[in-house]
Amino acid sequence: MFDIGLNITSSQFDHDRDEMIARARAAGVDSMLFTGTSLEESDRACAFARRYAGCWSTAGVHPHDASTWNDESAARLRALASEPEVVAIGECGLDFNRNFSTPAEQEHAFTEQLRLAAALALPVFLHCRDAHARFLALLDPWLDKLPGAVLHCFTGTEQEARECLARGMYLGITGWVCDERRGLELRALLPIIPADRLLLETDAPYLLPRDLTPKPASRRNEPCWLPHILTQVAQWRGEDPAWLEAATDANAARLFLKNASPA
């Protein structure tokens, strides 16, 4: 099973990172993509991908950190993207919910990362929150120059999902869909996502599925819970879990591993 979104550099894993990876393996999660959210964290994510077999990483600047983008950022990302473990540019995009960086800073950093991904022929690992229309307006000119794109941790509306899917994008589904308070709209739209455009992720240590029983004492999410997300998504889509696992694994390999060196 392939978890396409694990925040491996989180300090929440500092005391048991090796054990967390071992638990994932024991649960059948044998492939993982580690998310880079800043230049420094992207470098660390790459180092961890080098350390753990069957793992890769992204390199990018999250919209929260867009204010750090400067004249040297693209060159540093380009150098990092030359590492065999790095298989996508991101996490990049727009987040107008918190605006930790200004909208102008976010749009500039996003556009420059799209430019870099196109130049390097790498897929993009995308973030969008409360910015759908502007997100698509900036993304659209680049889509035909990119080998692929996934909107990670999709939590939008059915209309937003359809607009992304019409552009050939993949949608990443997390344990958010297991939340009976705020995940019902996402759960209802699962059947409209073509099987060849669906990816699964935990976004660990965040977004622990609320319907886990018993819940882990730490309340921390881990990639070992990806099989639970898979089972629930398959049920709500009316599909066999083993079939959906094979389909989503194939999607992840097609998007991220076309040119990757064996991990």
UniProtKB/Swiss-Prot annotation:
GO molecular function: 3'-5'-RNA exonuclease activity; magnesium ion binding; single-stranded DNA 3'-5' DNA exonuclease activity
Cellular component, GO, one term: cytoplasm
UniProt subcellular location: Cytoplasm
InterPro entries listed in its UniProt record: DNase_TatD-rel_CS, Exonuc_TatD, Metal_Hydrolase, TatD-like, TatD-type_Hydrolase
Cofactor(s) recorded in Swiss-Prot or TrEMBL: Mg(2+)
Binding site for a divalent metal cation: 91, 127, 152
Location, primary (coarse class): cytoplasm
Protein family (similarity comment): Belongs to the metallo-dependent hydrolases superfamily. TatD-type hydrolase family. TatD subfamily.
Record's subunit section: Monomer.
Documented EC number(s): 3.1.11.-, 3.1.13.-
Enzyme class: hydrolase
Full protein name: 3'-5' ssDNA/RNA exonuclease TatD
UniProt entry tagged with the keyword Transferase: no
Source taxon at top rank: Bacteria
PANTHER family: DEOXYRIBONUCLEASE TATDN1 (PTHR10060:SF15), TATD FAMILY DEOXYRIBONUCLEASE (PTHR10060)
PROSITE patterns named among the record's database cross-references: TATD_3 (PS01091)
Function comment: 3'-5' exonuclease that prefers single-stranded DNA and RNA. May play a role in the H(2)O(2)-induced DNA damage repair.
NCBIfam families from the UniProt entry: PRK10425.1
UniProt keyword annotation of Magnesium present: yes
CDD domains given in the database record: TatD_DNAse
Protein keywords: Cytoplasm, Exonuclease, Hydrolase, Magnesium, Metal-binding, Nuclease
